[in-house]
């Protein structure tokens, strides 16, 4: 029998040196190409620990990095697969993080910030021209080529980058770093290249004053700020920033992605292309001082989060009851709040709010300068939560057509109204869409409380949650119904379909009775129809 030849090209051609960094499945080490003596950084991935989906991500990252050749992007020189390991050979960048370099400078002005963001925009523009969205622009991924004065800024880490066609907008999953996420990602809307420009706006804001535009200890409140575009230019630090700089930030931090400035447009902005005459040359000592604190906070909280991830007990029951020793956790996930306090909604518009904490713990955003998406797992879980929201919205809207698109024709269900019987198919549910749901004329607000998603391979998932439904009864009094639900999802032809659900507790949405004596509504003790889907 012929023996299989194992590739040893990396081992033969490269010599490894000290460790430069470490990830969950990878380590970065300095290396030298033996024939030339040229030094590089080798990202070494332990492929024995990777799932099939992780392998796809690795291939995508290598494919994207091979495509991008630009002086402001860390370049991939080689991609080699050996038994048990994959090697990505990158530029060796020795200048450290851009933000750390800025605080070590004796002089730093608005014009310097303009030069920094210009290089970042050049890298982003190159990505976008090649159909690549980075999705994780943040200070940790902005490096300097060397320690020399005036060294080029280099964009790094394309682990979350995606490939898009032209100006394609789609839901690519919930990925990024909390303070840099765009409103459309937080709304779980289709998104594309504009998400990178939003992150550039956040970075530029920090470059000018040393602190971020959106900030809150509580992640939910932080996300509300971002979705509302709630930032300002407070005195006195912003009084010395030119109007042109503020104008560029406003154009980058535009809530509507269709109206947000593009990378190529930003490069033509006067504050960028006419820097010498437009940007201020005044030294910004307060910015440097604030940036030092910002950097220290990033590093400290990053270290705490790393420790937590390494030592966390992932038992959901324990984590709901006990905080890890020595770590303060802002655990407000079980508090039900209404989005009406911050975002006005039409009176009769059915709403679905997700208040969740998939792992049972919720760290404060101060510790969350780490990229969301445990390599893609969280994005996939968010996909399941999103499609569950869509299904419940279809129910609230009485939209049977939308409901059937999300559900498998052979949907099976256990629910109180079926009296202990297993219901199969759509006819049982059709009755309620055609006869009960059209009679709803009151506001309905559905809350998915604390959903837990279990992924079963690449194409199946199970979600369990508490479903709260708020409504106004016939007397104008607010009421709330609760049920516990579990739904099983299966992906067919790239689309998720609900194949089974199990609901306990009370039915969810009260419906006006078809016939009420004396024309009086009676939700408190009279007969009522109930939604059963």
Swiss-Prot record:
UniProt region (Disordered), positions on chain: 337-375
N-acetylalanine PTM sites in chain numbering: 2
One of the record's GO cellular component terms: calcium- and calmodulin-dependent protein kinase complex
Gene3D superfamilies: 3.10.450.50, 6.10.140.620, Phosphorylase Kinase, domain 1 (3.30.200.20), Transferase(Phosphotransferase) domain 1 (1.10.510.10)
A Pfam family matched in the record: CaMKII_AD
Expression across tissues: Isoform Delta 1 is the predominant form in the brain, isoform Delta 2 and isoform Delta 3 predominate in the aorta and isoform Delta 4 in skeletal muscle.
Protein's GO biological process: calcium ion transport; cardiac muscle cell contraction; cardiac muscle contraction; cell growth involved in cardiac muscle cell development; endoplasmic reticulum calcium ion homeostasis; G1/S transition of mitotic cell cycle; intracellular potassium ion homeostasis; negative regulation of sodium ion transmembrane transport
Residue ranges, annotated region (Autoinhibitory domain): 283-292
Catalytic residues (UniProt): 136 (proton acceptor)
Upregulating conditions: By cocaine in cardiomyocytes.
Residue ranges the record marks as coiled coil: none
Single annotated GO MF: sodium channel inhibitor activity
EC number, UniProt record: 2.7.11.17
Activity control: Activated by Ca(2+)/calmodulin. Binding of calmodulin results in conformational change that relieves intrasteric autoinhibition and allows autophosphorylation of Thr-287 which turns the kinase in a constitutively active form and confers to the kinase a Ca(2+)-independent activity.
Domain notes: The CAMK2 protein kinases contain a unique C-terminal subunit association domain responsible for oligomerization.
Recorded family membership: Belongs to the protein kinase superfamily. CAMK Ser/Thr protein kinase family. CaMK subfamily.
Task performed by this protein: Calcium/calmodulin-dependent protein kinase involved in the regulation of Ca(2+) homeostatis and excitation-contraction coupling (ECC) in heart by targeting ion channels, transporters and accessory proteins involved in Ca(2+) influx into the myocyte, Ca(2+) release from the sarcoplasmic reticulum (SR), SR Ca(2+) uptake and Na(+) and K(+) channel transport. Targets also transcription factors and signaling molecules to regulate heart function. In its activated form, is involved in the pathogenesis of dilated cardiomyopathy and heart failure.
This protein's name: Calcium/calmodulin-dependent protein kinase type II subunit delta
Annotated source species: Rattus norvegicus
